[in-house]
Structures are given as C-alpha cells and as structure tokens.
C-alpha cells in the first residue's frame, strides 16, 4: 500500500486561529484510493522548518501533499520550500503571470507586483488550474515520489484535488460504506451487533461517535470484497431500523429534504435557542425552496407571543422552555407558512440561564404534522455551540421520523 503525508502550512493553523479541515478531507479521500496515511502535520510559515519537514516527508512517503502558502505575500513560502528541498528552480510562467495581472486589473483597477509571485512554477511541475481563486496548484514527480502543492482555502483546494485524483489511483483502492445512526449509544451498538459487525475478518470496522452527529460505523476493505461489505451493511440495516438516518455521504438534512420531496410535503421552522441554525443548515441544500416555506427566529418571549401566537399564559405558567410553548410555536409557524410540517425548538444553550428544574442543556422540540403533534424534552451536554448543533440534529431527526410515519 502506498504511503501519503499531508502538510498543512500556515501560522494561522499553528496558532489555532483557523481549523484545518483540509487534512481531514485529503486523508479521507486518499484512504478511499488505497493510500496509507503516515501522518498529517501542521507547519508554520517558517522556511527552515518547512524544508526540514518536506525532506522528511519525501523520505517517508510516496505521496506528499501540501496545503497553503501559495499566495502572493512574503510569508507564502511553500513553492520556495519545496523547490529548495528537491534542488529545482522556480520558473516564471508568463501565461499565468499575465492572467493574474489581467484579473487584478479587472477587479482592483491595478496589479500589485506581488501578484506575479503566484506565477512561479517549480521546474518540471504540472500546473493545476484554480477555477475559484488565483493561486494555481502544482504536481510534480521527484525520485519516484509525487509532490502536490495546493492552496489553503477549502473552496479552492477541494475541486482542484478532485480534478487530479484519478491520476493518483493505486492498485490498492479501498471500498468504504458508512452507516450513520442516532439514538443508540456507540457501546450498545457495537456490543449488540458484534456478531454481524465482525462476521468478516477482511472488513475493517471503525466507529466515530459525535455528540453533534450521532454514531457512524465505517466498513472498509479492498475493492475486490465490495459485495461482501455490502452484504454486511445490508444485514445490519434492518436490525438498526429507524436509528439509521443516513448512509455514506448523506447527512440528516439531506435525508429530510429527500423525504419531503418524495412525498410532496413542505416544512417551516420556529427557532429560539438554535437562532436560525436549523434553517441555515437546511438551505445549504440546492433546490430546497421546493419544500422549505420559511422560518421565524423568535428569541424573545415577545416575539414568540406577537409573531408565532404563543399565549402569554402558556409562557407564564410553563416557561418559554417547555413542551407547551414549543407546541404553540410549531402551530404558529405551520399557520403562518401554510406548511405540511413545522418544527419548533426552545432551550437553554448556556452558559447561563439554567436553573435546578431546567439546567443548561434543557431543550424542548415539537413537530407539527398532518397526523398531529409530537413533542419531547432533552437534557443535552456540552458548550453553547454543541447544544445548538445537537438540538439541530435532533430536530431534523424528529422531523424525519414524523415524515416516515405520515407516509405509511
């Protein structure tokens, strides 16, 4: 199996100002194509350190990928560091330079001298076109190894890497299936279904538990045992039932969208503690306007009363964080938007605002459907962002289950 090393470059990564999502993406994609990931590293914009780690990576792996450091500023040193590490020249590509100058003039009225820095290509390197940003990538061979230079912004890196991925195929390509679940603890899942999970020694089983996304079970093996992996997955699925919310690359909101489209249903949201996160997550899906009527972010009690029609007496008697309140919020949203389904969420995301009866993490959710209303109260853990994200996942899950019941 060929080995790969990923080097994420940038002071902003080392200092924790930006989260490195590129390495996660690259590692996952490379693993699917049969690469063993030796390591991922985060390096500062320091020429000597970069050269040292690049040379070590060349010794240890067949494929080295760098992300970041291809911009026009003085601290963008990846081109220089790679060229120095392998003893090759940097050559100015006149066509790229002119294109960068023309683009700068078009958008900014002038072209700073620094913009041309991005036109320098390592000797004998293939240019990887950047259709989103300005910094082109590079791919080259050295001493039987492949070195790839990619820009840092994920919106640029991902399509550029996908465009060259076929060139990196190995004879060790892997096949992976994923089952995504909610409502069943990782330990319970692995214990109760271990006979199915470990029925084939050629399949590697891995689980990933996330408070924000549930439990994912990953099945991986050589491409030639694809049918065997599918058999294990298909054997397990009926056992897990509605706990399975998605397979492979799909997310919870994707599944909800597909169910709504399939049944010609529409939905609306009334959000309090999630602050629009449910709606924002949903509209990430292209074409969602066909099923999404709208939403109300009613954070204050006044907004809940005046916009959604929650009775003042309900809030005074039960509180804004109560099933009684979210039921009326859901009914109000359904009426306002004339949707088939509506979902309402109200909770205490923290860090303050909790009490002995309703501690931080108390979240109430209601789903209004053609069949009636379903509501529940959850006691969630974590910080403010985790509680909001978990509430969003649970809200979509309650909606998913509600749609399934309505369709028979």
Curated annotation (Swiss-Prot):
Signal sequence annotation: none
| SMART domains, per the entry | MoCF_biosynth
User: Which Gene3D superfamilies does the protein's record reference?
Assistant: 3.30.70.2860, CinA-like (3.90.950.20), MoaB/Mog-like domain (3.40.980.10)
Question: Which Pfam families does this entry report, sorted A to Z?
Answer: CinA, MoCF_biosynth
Q: Which SUPFAM superfamilies match?
A: CinA-like, Molybdenum cofactor biosynthesis proteins
Q: Which NCBIfam families does the protein's record reference?
A: cinA_nterm (TIGR00200), molyb_syn (TIGR00177), PncC_domain (TIGR00199), PRK00549.1 (NF001813)
Which PANTHER family does the UniProt record give?
NICOTINAMIDE-NUCLEOTIDE AMIDOHYDROLASE PNCC, NMN AMIDOHYDROLASE-LIKE PROTEIN YFAY
Per the similarity annotation, which family is this? Belongs to the CinA family.
The name of this protein is CinA-like protein
Species of origin reads Fervidobacterium nodosum (strain ATCC 35602 / DSM 5306 / Rt17-B1)
């Amino acid at each position: 199996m060929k080995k790969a090393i990923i080097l994420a470059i940038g002071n902003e990564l080392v200092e924790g100002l930006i989260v490195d999502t590129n390495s996660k993406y690259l590692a996952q994609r490379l693993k699917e194509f049969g690469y063993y990931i030796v390591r991922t590293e985060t390096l500062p914009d320091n020429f000597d350190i970069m050269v040292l780690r690049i040379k070590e990576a060349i010794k240890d792996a067949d494929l080295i990928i760098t992300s970041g450091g291809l911009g026009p500023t003085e601290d963008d040193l990846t081109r220089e560091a790679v060229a120095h590490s392998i003893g090759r020249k940097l050559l100015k590509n006149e066509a790229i330079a002119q294109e960068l100058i023309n683009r700068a003039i078009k958008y900014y009225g002038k072209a700073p001298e620094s913009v041309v820095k991005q036109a320098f290509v390592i000797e004998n390197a293939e240019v990887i076109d950047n259709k989103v940003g300005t910094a082109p990538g590079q791919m080259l061979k050295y001493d039987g190894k492949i070195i790839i230079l990619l820009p840092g912004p994920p919106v640029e890196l991902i399509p550029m890497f996908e465009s060259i991925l076929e060139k990196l195929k190995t004879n060790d390509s892997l096949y992976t299936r994923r089952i995504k679940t909610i409502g069943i603890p990782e330990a319970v899942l692995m214990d109760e279904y271990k006979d199915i999970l470990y029925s084939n020694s050629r399949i590697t089983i891995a689980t990933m538990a996330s408070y924000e996304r549930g439990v994912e079970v990953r099945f991986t093996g050589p491409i030639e045992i694809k049918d065997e992996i599918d058999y294990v997955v298909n054997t397990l699925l009926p056992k897990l039932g509605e706990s399975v919310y998605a397979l492979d690359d799909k997310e919870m909101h994707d599944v909800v969208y597909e169910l709504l489209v399939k049944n010609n249903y529409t939905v609306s949201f009334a959000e309090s503690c999630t602050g629009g996160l449910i709606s924002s997550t949903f509209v990430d899906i292209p074409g969602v306007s066909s099923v999404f009527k709208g939403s109300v972010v009613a954070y204050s009690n006044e907004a809940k009363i005046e916009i959604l029609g929650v009775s003042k007496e309900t809030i005074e008697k039960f509180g804004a964080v109560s099933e009684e309140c979210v039921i009326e919020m859901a009914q109000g949203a359904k009426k306002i938007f004339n949707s088939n389904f509506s979902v309402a969420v109200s909770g205490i995301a923290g860090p303050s605002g909790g009490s002995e009866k309703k501690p931080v993490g108390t979240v109430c959710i209601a789903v209004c459907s053609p069949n009636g209303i379903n509501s529940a109260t959850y006691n969630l853990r974590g910080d403010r962002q985790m509680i909001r994200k978990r509430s969003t996942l649970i809200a979509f899950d309650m909606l998913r289950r509600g749609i399934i019941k309505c369709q028979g």
